[in-house]
Amino acid sequence: MYAATLELCASSEVVVGLFSSWYVKAACQASGVPSACVHYYPGMIPSRSVPPFGFPAWRWLNPVGWALFSRVIDLAFGSATKRFFASKGLPKVRRALTDVLLSERLNLVATSPTLFPAPADWGALNVVCGDFVPRADQQPWEPEPALAEFLEDGEKPVLFSFGTMAHLAPERARELVLGAVKQAKVRAVVQMRGAEESGRDGDTFFVRWAPHRQLAPRCAAMVIHGGAGTTHAALRAGIPAVVVPFIFEQKLWGRLLQRAGSAAPPLPFWKATPESLGARIREVLGSQALRSRAAALASAVAREDGTGVALGKLEALAPR
């Protein structure tokens, strides 16, 4: 990958990579080409007001949390990256987080600034630009006839999507979702890849895949694991959400939606029961405040242009 990136650098003014693609930074340093990092999660850039990846939201502990987090990153990446950068004659790696995983030129955080305004101490090189989504006409989709009929045949359903997280405990995920649907007495569209069920079963319709951006606006609420994609899908659809985080990263997304006023408190997957999830669904469906706030947030997010902001910053980074 390093050699391939060196070839890319030879014909590029700026190279963009994910924060974890440290070989991109190495190749750019070797070539003298500016590099930018893309982050789909806002909890990787140090700030006094934001907890690090996986840490609790205790603001007074954030400086200590970031020091510990930096040490964890050193243990995970430090030895390998230090050896590699040294072998290429590149600047010495002192801290893997700041010297390898972050760009000293431009970090693009693909998160809605409506949901997560940039912390005041981030400075100009860390930009919350908005999520990257194609225009609707670039991703045309219409539901299959049976799903279209289901969507029109009664009250708007609740959309359930745990993404790839459901594979961590497929049976538990299935029992939790179907039990919650029964407890909440709602119609539901359930997205589960690899599920045995497909099509309509009473008030539930099973799909293996459907684009959240197009399907969510046809639903009353979303029950999601809280990844970047599903979080922004709920936000753009203007519907309230119940976040059921499987891992610690997803807890932050759940807290952000709750803080924004469009979601109930997160309900961790490993503690959730059909009864508790069903009650949480009824809570969001019955809350006019959550529905109104979700609609207002969607209007604000619709005015964002994450791709356009990112392109503008990258163009400014290119040599003149």
Predicted features and spans:
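A short helix->loop->beta-strand "cap" motif at the edges of active sites that frequently abuts
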Residues: 31-34, 105, 186, 239
